[in-house]
Amino acid sequence: MNPERHPRPALLAALLLTLSAPQAMALSGDKDQPIDIVADSVDIDEARGTSTYTGNVEINQGSIRLLADKVVVEHRPGQPRKVNASGAPAKFRQLPDNSKEYVTGTARQLHYQLDSEELVLDGDAQLNQGKDRFNSDRIVYDRVKAVVKAGAAAQGKERVRVTIQPGQR
């Protein structure tokens, strides 16, 4: 077997990232903070249950920050249900509990389902913590199940690239 194609280092890297991701993404206090939204314009359609923010959209909630060209929030009475952000790229960051380093991510589209707490980074997706990096065309993070999937495991079409810096685990 060609040592450059040996599956164990890739499997180990994916396992390490999967094990560290729930800790990296868990932000216990952010969901209880108020949401602040700034944009060039907003269109609220109560009949459809959507709010569409366009132009230099900035959303902040606790340590969470989302920057996008366009954000569509789908909601039921009084409660957001789903957030779809798009940009070139759309960006987010959040500060994990017990950490000084932000988790950051970029993708052409970010989709967050509030009920299931699933975040999907779609199109040139990248997830970072410190110098560790996770790249694929699609990354799915399920906060409830504490599972990260990328590439084929996340119904993506490209391979996954994981970079883990030594001495950070």
Across the structure, where does each feature detected by a protein language model lie?
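Mature-chain termini and adjacent capping regions
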Residues: 1-169
